[in-house]
Structure formats: structure tokens, C-alpha cells
UniProtKB/Swiss-Prot annotation:
Membrane topology: Multi-pass membrane protein
Periplasmic side: 132-158, 209-225, 280-300, 362-370, 420-440
Domain remarks in the Swiss-Prot or TrEMBL record: The PTS EIIB type-1 domain is phosphorylated by phospho-EIIA-Glc (EIII-Glc) on a cysteinyl residue. Then, it transfers the phosphoryl group to the sugar substrate concomitantly with the sugar uptake processed by the PTS EIIC type-1 domain. The EIIC domain type-1 forms the PTS system translocation channel and contains the specific substrate-binding site.
Name this polypeptide is given: PTS system trehalose-specific EIIBC component
Segments passing through the bilayer: 111-131, 159-179, 188-208, 226-246, 259-279, 301-321, 341-361, 371-391, 399-419, 441-461
């Protein structure tokens, strides 16, 4: 494979990204070279896209990314050999890329880093609860559930709650661990802090308002013994506070006193602040977010809110703001037992892939299918960046067609109050996360998200081709 690589193309790529001196670091993923450039403005993307091995390029998260294809590893090795760059891992690249980010991009990046390690558990929990609802909560034709009809399934239904409860009920433990780790603190202290937020000594958060909690009486003031089960924002703020406290203490406490002073003082202060100030404040924020989303997505404004979110979600992905929707989903699951947001995200994934299908059907451009076919499949499975950056944004109108299809599908979901058990896989498999009573409506919404973008994209492509106005950004 290395012999098939034209060294002239490699040298030209180096020149077009600004030369060897402009490359801070370079790594690669499955299909893309990921450059961190000292001066991003010196790169010439339009000329780079003319290179024979390049299928597209874009800037995201402070990285200049060049789409090569599945043989990107060979090009990476040739590039490393030509530039003399040392091979780096993804974390080193991300750290270097932050220098090219604006403050709000860095904030979103930090937010994503905290929640990303939790995704395997959260996705598993969403799918497990979905399967549990199918066997235990969905009435069959005789009015009974499968668990009622078959005792063995009732056992499975009860057993699966052990996993579902562990993931969502004790979610603050994972959030505190990840937040403290991100801040450079000791992860095990984050776990301990998280456990203190969901300890059996505390009144269950779901009973708040139904009964009076006990208190810790400190004389001049008291603190209610209330837990933060399944709460996102209190756990996030508490974890960040512990990380800040510990890292600051490390700087001023001598090494020989570290184990005696830093962990103990950090934990006591963080746990006290978590229950006295941070937790109640975070609960207020979380309740406010839940109130706003509930009225926008489930009240009389639901059709409008769902349609707008479905239409605008793809642009949120481009800006990176979509990372914040994870916390909203988790907050809704805690307060409502499900989320109306995740179904709209899954539909947006489908619509982006469908717009690419419209291009595949209409276009006969040389080598385009090498990126369009994998991009469409990827989007239908929940990862939309290859579809958006590789095809839809290049032509521009497929992006709008996908947004229209997603908005109309969202409108249908809003009209019918579609809810998901939790976050899960996106795209077509996203139906597995939907509460079973909404499967038929969601299947129809999926059909809208597939058909509308394909038809609109194909029609506009062919019309522009006939008029000679088809252009690529």
C-alpha cells in the first residue's frame, strides 16, 4: 500500500497546510488526518481538496481534518516520515488543539470530555430499560404483558432493573469520578464524593416534597439529609469543586504531608459544600432546565419546540453545542422518567444520512461514492460528521433538505409526545431507545426523515444540474 502513495501528493499536502513549521501535531482516526496547526489561517482547504487522495477537509474542535479514506494510516506514516513529526496519541492532539479554540469552544470541549466516558454505561442503560419495558410494560393483544404471561420473563424483568438502577440511580458517582479526573484530581476521591450524594443515609430525592427530611444540626445552621439520586448538575458542580479544591491544595501542601492533608481536607470540604450549597443550587438549576424543556417539548408548545429542535440540531452539531444536550436528556430522565429530546436527535441523524442517499442516487461524480456511501451508513447508525462535512455542507442544499426532513419528523413526535427511555444509539437503531408505546409513531417519523431528504435532495440536485448552477463549496 505504501508503494501506491505518491510522494509528490504528500509534499503538496504539507505545503498546502502551511508547511512543516505550521504543523504542531498530526494524528489520524479511521478515515481522517487530524492536524493541529500553529496558524490555521495559512491552510488552503480548496486547493487541498483538489489533491487526488483527498475527499474533503474541514475544521472542527481546533483541528484541521483532511478526509482520506480507510487507507489513511498509510498516508499518515508517509506524512510522519516526510515531516519528522513524532507520533502522538489523541489526548495530546486534543490538548494541543485547545490553543486554537475560542473560550466557548473550550467550555464545550471540557463538558464533552466529562460526559464521554459515561456513554457506554448510559447507552447500555437506555437499551436495557427499553427491552425491560417491552417485556414488562407493553400490553399484548390479551391485555397482559409478556412478563405476566411468562413467569420466567418476570424474573428477567426484575433482574434488568438491577442494572438500570445502578446506571441511572447512581449516575452522580460516575459524573463526580469523571469531573474530578478531568480537573486533574484523584478519581477515587470523585467516586467517594459521588457515593456521598446517593448514600442510603440520605432521603431519596424522589421523596422530596412528600416528606420532611432529617437534618444535620451544626448549631448555627442545619443541612437537610437529602440525596441527589440521578441528578446531573449537582453532581457535575460538586465534582468540579472537588477537583479545584484538591489541585489547589496540592500546590501549597508539602509532599511529605500530602496523604495526610490533601485527600482528607479535600473530601470534607467538598462533601460539606456539596450538601450545603452546591447541591441545592444545582438542583434548582436542574429543575429550571427540566421545567423549560418540559414546557417546550411536552406542553402546548411541544409541536413547535420539537420541530425547531429537529430543524436546528444539525447546526448545533457543527458548532459543538450539541454536547450539552446530553445533560438535558439525563435531567429529563430524572424528572420525567423519559426524554423527548433523544428521539429528535436520532431522527436528525437519519435525515443527514438520507440527504447523502439523495446525492448518491443523483450524482455520478468520480470517486464521490468512496466517501458518500460510508458517510450515509455512518449517519444512519448515529454518527453524522462524515455525512455533514464530507457531502452535505459541500453542496449546501442537502444540509437544508436534511434539516427540513428532521424538522417535519420532529413535528410529528411533538404532536404525539414521543419519549425515549434514555439516551442510546442514534440513527435507525435509535428506535430501540424509544418507549414501546410510541414505536408506531416513531417509525412513521423515521420514514419522514428518510423520504423527505432523499426526495428533496434528488430533485434539487437534478434541477441545479440541468440549469448548470450546481456548485460545491
Amino acid at each position: 500500500m505504501m508503494s501506491k502513495i505518491n510522494q509528490t501528493d504528500i509534499d503538496r499536502l504539507i505545503e498546502l497546510v502551511g508547511g512543516r513549521g505550521n504543523i504542531a501535531t498530526v494524528s489520524h482516526c479511521i478515515t481522517r488526518l487530524r492536524f493541529v496547526l500553529n496558524q490555521p489561517a495559512n491552510a488552503r482547504p480548496k486547493e487541498i481538496e483538489q489533491l487526488p487522495m483527498v475527499k474533503g477537509c474541514f475544521t472542527n474542535a481546533g483541528q484541521f481534518q483532511v478526509v482520506i479514506g480507510t487507507n489513511v494510516g498509510d498516508y499518515y506514516q508517509a506524512l510522519i516520515a516526510s515531516t519528522g513529526q513524532a507520533q502522538v496519541d489523541k489526548e495530546q492532539v486534543k490538548k494541543a488543539a485547545r490553543h486554537n479554540m475560542k473560550w466557548h469552544e473550550q467550555l464545550i470541549s471540557h463538558f464533552a470530555v466529562i460526559f464521554f466516558p459515561l456513554l457506554p454505561a448510559l447507552i447500555s442503560g437506555g437499551l436495557i430499560l427499553g427491552f425491560r419495558n417491552v417485556i414488562g410494560d407493553l400490553p399484548m393483544s390479551n391485555g397482559q404483558t409478556l412478563a405476566q404471561m411468562y413467569p420466567s420473563l418476570q424474573t428477567i424483568y426484575d433482574f434488568l432493573w438491577l442494572i438500570g438502577e445502578a446506571i441511572f440511580f447512581y449516575l452522580p458517582v460516575g459524573i463526580c469520578w469523571s469531573a474530578v479526573k478531568k480537573m486533574g484530581g484523584t478519581p477515587i476521591l470523585g467516586i467517594v464524593l459521588g457515593v456521598t450524594l446517593v448514600s442510603p443515609q440520605l432521603m431519596n430525592a424522589y421523596l422530596l416534597g412528600q416528606q420532611l427530611p432529617e437534618v444535620w444540626d451544626f448549631g448555627m445552621f442545619s443541612i437537610a439529609k437529602v440525596g441527589y439520586q440521578a441528578q446531573v448538575i449537582p453532581a457535575l458542580l460538586a465534582g468540579l469543586a472537588l477537583g479545584v479544591i484538591e489541585t489547589r491544595l496540592k500546590r501549597i501542601v508539602p509532599d511529605y504531608l500530602y496523604l495526610v492533608v490533601v485527600p482528607v481536607c479535600s473530601l470534607i470540604l467538598a462533601v460539606f459544600l456539596a450538601h450545603a450549597l452546591i447541591g441545592p443550587f444545582g438542583r434548582m438549576i436542574g429543575d429550571g432546565v427540566a421545567f423549560a424543556v418540559r414546557h417546550l417539548m411536552t406542553g402546548s408548545f411541544a409541536p413547535i419546540g420539537a420541530a425547531l429542535f429537529g430543524f436546528l440540531y444539525a447546526p448545533l452539531v457543527i458548532t459543538g453545542v450539541h454536547q450539552t444536550t446530553l445533560a438535558i436528556d439525563l435531567q429529563m430522565i430524572q424528572s420525567m422518567g423519559g426524554t423527548p429530546v433523544w428521539p429528535l436527535i436520532a431522527l436528525s441523524n437519519i435525515a443527514q444520512g438520507s440527504a447523502v442517499i439523495g446525492i448518491i442516487i443523483s450524482s455520478r461524480k468520480h470517486n464521490e461514492r468512496e466517501i458518500s456511501v460510508p458517510a450515509a451508513i455512518s449517519a444512519w447508525l448515529g454518527v453524522t460528521e462524515p455525512a455533514m462535512y464530507g457531502i452535505n455542507l459541500k453542496y449546501r442544499f442537502p444540509m437544508l433538505c436534511a434539516m427540513i426532513g428532521s424538522g417535519l419528523a420532529g413535528l410529528l413526535c411533538g404532536l404525539n409526545g414521543v419519549m425515549a427511555n434514555g439516551i442510546g444509539v442514534g440513527g435507525l437503531p435509535g428506535i430501540l431507545s424509544i418507549q414501546p408505546s410510541y414505536w408506531q409513531v416513531f417509525a412513521l417519523a423515521m420514514a419522514i426523515a428518510i423520504i423527505i431528504p432523499i426526495v428533496l435532495t434528488s430533485f434539487i440536485y437534478q434541477r441545479k444540474y440541468r440549469l448548470g448552477t450546481l456548485d460545491i463549496v
